[in-house]
């Protein structure tokens, strides 16, 4: 089966990962695309092949040369993230549609690759003030980090109109319902 793809992208703190996890836990038709990266694994919190495929820089670059990635990006020097073609195929081989939780750049790249087979969704917070509150409530950001994330959010938000749908995450339960409706509608109208 060559299924459909659901691309969820957003600035940090938008609730994108929470929405994607909810969809994965409640919709058996979809499977999660695990990204590959070159950063160090957080030993106590992450597992290779579950959270990410952790690759060395040399291995990642070799796979780039072999055209094994659907999309990839060097986010910092020597720090790569990407989506392996084999990962998309793995999910399709299970008879499922693929869901992605990726940054804005990756989301646009995936949409460009897959075109009408993919629905790209930009998850948006109602306001910058709300995003700032969410990031502060996480209690994981220094003041400089918070400032940098807010600047990045403004930049990433400038691309929101390039996505098929903008999903405003104001009330989480309502956002879950809307996300399910988006998937159902896309599958019903793109069943070819």
UniProtKB/Swiss-Prot annotation:
It holds the Pfam family Guanylate_kin. It comes from the Bacteria. Its EC number is 2.7.4.8. It catalyses: GMP + ATP = GDP + ADP. Its main location: cytoplasm. GO terms for cellular component: cytosol. The keyword Cell membrane does not apply. CDD domains: GMPK. ATP binds at residues 10-17. Essential for recycling GMP and indirectly, cGMP. PANTHER family: GUANYLATE KINASE, GUANYLATE KINASE-RELATED. Belongs to the guanylate kinase family. This is Guanylate kinase. It comes from Cytophaga hutchinsonii (strain ATCC 33406 / DSM 1761 / CIP 103989 / NBRC 15051 / NCIMB 9469 / D465).
């Amino acid at each position: 089966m060559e299924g459909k793809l659901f691309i969820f992208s957003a600035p940090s703190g938008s609730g994108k990962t929470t929405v994607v996890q909810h969809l994965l836990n409640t919709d058996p038709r979809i499977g999660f695309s695990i990204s590959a990266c070159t950063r160090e694994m957080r030993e106590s919190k992450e597992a290779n092949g579950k959270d990410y495929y952790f690759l060395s820089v040399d291995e990642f670059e070799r796979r780039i040369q072999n055209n094994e990635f659907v999309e990839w990006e060097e986010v910092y020097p020597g720090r790569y993230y990407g989506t392996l073609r084999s990962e998309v195929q793995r999910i399709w081989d299970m008879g499922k549609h693929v869901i992605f939780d990726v940054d804005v750049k990756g989301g646009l790249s995936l949409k460009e690759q897959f075109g009408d087979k993919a629905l790209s969704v930009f998850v948006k917070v109602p306001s910058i003030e709300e995003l700032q509150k969410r990031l502060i409530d996480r209690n994981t950001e220094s003041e400089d980090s918070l400032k940098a994330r807010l600047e990045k959010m403004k930049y990433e938000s400038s691309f929101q109109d390039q996505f098929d749908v903008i999903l405003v995450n104001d009330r989480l339960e309502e956002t879950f319902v809307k996300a399910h409706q988006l998937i159902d509608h896309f599958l019903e109208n793109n069943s070819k």
